Amino acid sequence: MRAALALRGRVQLVALTSSPDRVPALRAAGITPLVADLDVPSSLGRLAGIATRVLHLAPPANVEGTGWWRDARTVALARALRLRSLPDALVYGSTSGVYGDCGGALVKETRAASPHTPRAHRRVDAERSVRWLGRAGVAVRILRIPGIYAPDREGGTPRERLRKGTPVLRSEDDVYTNHIHADDLARACVVALWRGGTQRVFNASDDSDIKMGDYVDLAADLYGLPRPRRIAREQAGAELPLSLLSFMGESRRLDNTRMKRELRVRLLYPTVATGLQPPKTQSLP
C-alpha cells in the first residue's frame, strides 16, 4: 500500500486483492481494485494486458508434501501476464533469506543462492518464474528484502517483544541481521519500476551493520524499556519459538551498493537508529 500511495496521482493504479472486504479501502485510496486470487489461476484472466508495470509482493503459500518448494502463485501470475501484451517491467519482492547462512559475511547480489528454509526455497522458485518473463522481454528486477520495520507498522518494531521479555542471544552467539524501513522499501519498489537493468537483483537493505541483540537493545533504549536477557545459543532452543530460532540460524550483512548506485535510492532512514524514531515524510527521489 505504501508504494501505491507514493504513486497516487502520478499513474493509474490497479491492485489485485483476493478479499472483497478490501475493495472500499482501495477505492478510497484512489486505487482500482481487481478481485482475483493467485491461488485460483482461472480467476486471473483480467490481469492479462492490464498494466505496463507490475509490482509483485505476494508471498508464496505455505505448502507441505509434494511441491513444498514451489511458488504456485508466481507461476500463475506469470502465466496470466503472458496471455496478452506483456508489461514493460515487473518488480518482484523476494527475500534475503535466499542467501542462507553466510557466517556474517558481507553479501553482494552475485553470491549464489543457498536457501536453508522452505520459505526461502519457495522464493528462489518465484525468482525463477519472474526470470522466465524476463526472457520474454519484460524488464524484471528482483528486490531481495530483509526484515521490514517501521514504528507506524503493525508489529513493525521490537516493542512487543521487549514487553514480553523475550531473551536474545549473547554477543558471541548472536547473528547479524538486516533491515529496511517500510518507507524506504516502498521508495525502492517504485523506482525499480522504471530504473535498473533487466534481469537485475538488488539487495533492498539499509546501511545498518548490527547484530540482532544489539538491534533489540537499541529499541529498548529508545522506548524506555528494559533491555532483554542475554542467553547462550544452547538455551535458546528451550526458550524461544521455532519461528524466531530460524532467523537466529542465519547471519549475513547485505551490501546495498548496487541499489544505491543503479536505482539511485536515497534512504530516508539509513540505519535502524534513525528509523526506529517517529516517522517523517519526504518526497520520492
Language-model regions, residue ranges each:
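NAD(P)-cofactor binding segment of oxidoreductase domains
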Residues: 47-91, 128
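Catalytic helix-loop patch of NAD(P)-dependent Rossmann-fold dehydrogenases
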Residues: 103-142
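Amphipathic terminal alpha-helices
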Residues: 270-285
